[in-house]
Amino acid sequence: SLIELTKMVFQETGKNPVTYYTLYGCNCGVGRRGKPKDATDRCCFVHRCCYKKLTGCDPKKDRYSYSWENKAIVCGEKNPCLKELCECDKAVAICLRKNLGTYDKNYRFTMKFLCDKPEKC
C-alpha cells in the first residue's frame, strides 16, 4: 500500500516522500504519466511499469509485510502478488536513493501539461 511505499522511500532516502516526490517530474505521484524528465523521474516511471505487471492485488491499498534489516529492505510476503508488490516498492525506494544526486528542484510540482507523451513500459 501507499503506507509501506512511503516508509520504504523514507528509510532509503531520508526524505519525506510526500513533500519531496509526490508531484516530481512527470511520473512521481498517483496518476501521473509522461516522458521522464531525469533519472529520479525514471525511477517512478519504472515503478509504474512494475505495478502494471501485478495481477491479483491493489498496489495503492493492499498491505504487505517487510522488515528493515541492517539498512536493507527485506520483503517477507508468502502471497505471490504481495511479494511482487513489495519488490516493486523496494526497487523504487533503492532507485530514488541511488539517484538523489539527479534530483532537480525545478521538476518539483511539474504540471501535467509540461509532460510529453510517455514511452511504453
From Swiss-Prot:
Expressed by the venom gland. GO terms for cellular component: extracellular region. GO terms for molecular function: calcium ion binding; calcium-dependent phospholipase A2 activity; phospholipid binding; toxin activity. Keywords: Disulfide bond, Myotoxin, Secreted, Toxin. It is found in: Secreted. CDD domains: PLA2c (cd00125). GO terms for biological process: arachidonate secretion; lipid catabolic process; negative regulation of T cell proliferation; phospholipid metabolic process. It comes from the Eukaryota. Disulfide bonds join C26-C115, C28-C44, C43-C95, C49-C121, C50-C88, C57-C81, C75-C86. Its main location: secreted. It holds the Pfam family Phospholip_A2_1. Homodimer. Snake venom phospholipase A2 homolog that induces myonecrosis, and edema. Has low myotoxic activity. Belongs to the phospholipase A2 family. Group II subfamily. R49 sub-subfamily. This is Basic phospholipase A2 homolog zhaoermiatoxin.
